[in-house]
């Protein structure tokens, strides 16, 4: 094999840095040639016959490469912790080792290559390796073989020891995995030094011989040749450990057993395999270089060799993602990943060993990358202009729905819209909501709109998302909305809706304090509008029905409990001709006048008797007026109290009343004049009780109980005697009254009219009345005053068809006057008066049970009786007698009560038998007169 030619005298010889022998193809690959001064690199490939290449490789390795040999060490059977085993060196190598790593955790390797035990061990045989790495990054593996020392041999002397050392030859055994037939194949020959002096035969046992896999290795007992009988899989058995023994012809073991380790040399017979999860997520619009995930793969071939060196390659989507060829980490290649364009990306990944060489084994798989949503799309309106219609005065109703489109993930904050009326809602007439299902904007009217003021409202609606915009230059969008207000027939409206009036308290009744008018929104005038009060807690104001004028009806008192913060509210109702209504509020701001004087709060006070020391009490006053008609107060002591009492410590509303000199216990009357700031006030009496106090509570004395004896004086005894005499007289009077009481007289009443007519059994013929109509007098004159006060009289006047005027009277006077438009139905029955009134859209019905009808019925009956008996003609009982009949009324259920209607053809007086017990005495008198002719 040759290096590339070079110009003579210009460049030094190139250095071959790396060669590779392809066992499968039988080629040598010269990967790198470096010229020292320029570091130029050339790659050359030469092909030759397999045998020639193999020979060249052996010669090349002999000259240039480093091949550490296995190290055989004999140690005691029991090795303590910290025991030095041996030192690893790279004999014949120019490389400088920088790190050592033991494959057995029971041993550690120091920086100088010395191997030391980490714990106490019992060793018969043991094998492990040390990985050595030089300063250029290349590494070698040194095999360490431990065997137990033979103590007997050590005691026999130096000759025996020297013989034991050369008893077995070094045994660097290895086989290539998956070797091709034919089998068996020779592996290595073993020989014992005893074979020089003895005829020996060899026996092997252990793994691969007498243990699984049984029979893989065979031994020629005479020659010591170890053979392999079949292909070996390194991934299952990277090495085989068995022992060899030497026996003489008498089957005596002539030497110590030899531990044999057969290493299986790896070939690239396993393709890389994917491991772990290949489903990844990353946000759309993420920055370039953002880590997406890592593809993991393994190769069963020998680690840290080209056979297991994996290279990761993306097969597609290379414009969106990139992959680290050595680690398999996938990263975003740009910041333009768009979930709305493609929410999942299926990326093909190839994993190839041999560092990605064309002859490397490979596998392919798919990584699924899901793009998560960010709010990179604002909601957009489907129309450029929206319109809606609503009737005026409607509130809390839906006006219109505004649809939008949003490409972001549904039902996430990136998709959910939030709406706002950004223009035209200065008065707060509207509110916006979002339909959670359709994401539409819902426009509601929360305050009624006025067609007369704004028939058309131009609004602007803006749509946003719950989440802020990310990774986009787009802005929130707005759309105009035209809302047409429809006119409706409205009721009257007060302007202003709340009117404030300043009034002084105690204004005279009838004083006009203002006018509160309502206007028809359509006509802009107040014609035909009537005004009524809805609320007026104190009945202080009256409203003129036709004009809305407000007048004082009762005393306005600022200090009343109905007044709050000097204001008093009245609600007025306006009604137009179509019965539509509107309400307004009048707030009276009552101004204070000096109509109250200061009043002492507690006119009865207790003063503690302190013996020789003077005492005092606090006198407090209040005035319900406000400043300047109240505090500070002026306190003055009555003129006669000089020398007894004095006032001190005067404040705005209190004064201290103090004794001039100590006073004995007792009641004292102290006049004190209290005036407000305007000098208005009067003299008031303070009753001061001087007593021996049990205690004082907040400066107020609590007097003790007074001991007193009760005895009767002369007047008391006299009062008791007089009371006894009066009681005795009362008892005598009651006894007399009970013993002289008259018996009750039972009077029967068959007709039921005796409850009103007076009984009389002493009637006799008297002067007959000529004109019976004299008894037809008004009922109110018949009924006495005591009965009249309990009876309601009705006087009716029919003014026109379909129109009825009526007045109601009571003992207190006229209490109602009405004129009805649709007539009145009334009727009299025995014991009932019914009156139905229809009009003004209301129904009123009055039913009064009274005895007035009974009086009228009996009066009619008596009129006819007296008219008959008042006739003076001799033939007054004749059939052709002219008879007078009174007005029986309307609808009488008793029928005719004419006294003469039951007379027969004869002039007999038998009809009197049917008149009842009330008129039998009169009938008897008349009948007797007729028979006697008197």
From Swiss-Prot:
Annotated compartments: Cell junction, Desmosome; Cell membrane
GO molecular function, one term: calcium ion binding
GO biological process entries: cell-cell adhesion; convergent extension involved in gastrulation; desmosome assembly; epiboly involved in gastrulation with mouth forming second; heart contraction; heart development; heart morphogenesis; homophilic cell adhesion via plasma membrane adhesion molecules
InterPro entries xref list: Cadherin, Cadherin-like_dom, Cadherin-like_sf, Cadherin_CS, Cadherin_pro_dom, Cadherin_Y-type_LIR, Catenin-bd_sf, Desmosomal_cadherin
Source organism, top-level taxon: Eukaryota
Reported tissue expression: Expressed at low levels in the brain and heart.
Principal location listed in the UniProt entry: other
CDD domains xrefs: Cadherin_repeat
Keyword field: Calcium, Cell adhesion, Cell junction, Cell membrane, Glycoprotein, Membrane, Metal-binding, Repeat, Signal, Transmembrane, Transmembrane helix
Reported phenotype of the disruption mutant: Morpholino knockdowns show increased embryonic lethality, with embryos that die developing one of two clear phenotypes following developmental arrest at 10 hpf. The first group show severe epiboly arrest with desmosomal cadherins and enveloping layer becoming detached from the external yolk syncytial layer that continued to undergo epiboly. This results in a population of cells at the animal pole which maintain cell division and some gastrulation movements. In the second phenotype the enveloping layer is attached to the yolk but does not progress through epiboly.
TM region(s), chain numbering: 717-737
Comment text on domains: Three calcium ions are usually bound at the interface of each cadherin domain and rigidify the connections, imparting a strong curvature to the full-length ectodomain.
Protein name listed in UniProt: Desmocollin 2-like protein
Native source species: Danio rerio
The gene coding this protein: dsc2l
